[in-house]
Amino acid sequence: MHEIADIACNFTSDRFDKDLDEVIDRAVANNITKFGLICSRLSDLDKLLEIYNRFIKVMFFTIGVHPHHANEINAEYLKKLKEAISINNPHAIGETGLDFFRNLSTYEEQI
């Protein structure tokens, strides 16, 4: 049977606060062997790292900014983002890019 990886898990969402262990257990029981833990804003980083360290054998993590949060970015935010990347050595950079589906940040803010 093939192994499956979910490369975009938003486990920092409050929706997972009560049953994350069970969610991971069910996924592993269904052959999902790796989880990409996505950091979509710096305010999620502490929670993300706590989750990552609890499930380190099956997770990798990213640090970035989802385009919906582009309106939060300024020079100080970018400085903190670079520091977080340097200190925490994520497996990848992300979220990044453009996303106009819900228009939570304007085109100008995302560019």
Where in this protein do the model-derived segments appear?
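Mid-domain alpha/beta scaffold segments of enzyme catalytic cores
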Residues: 1-111
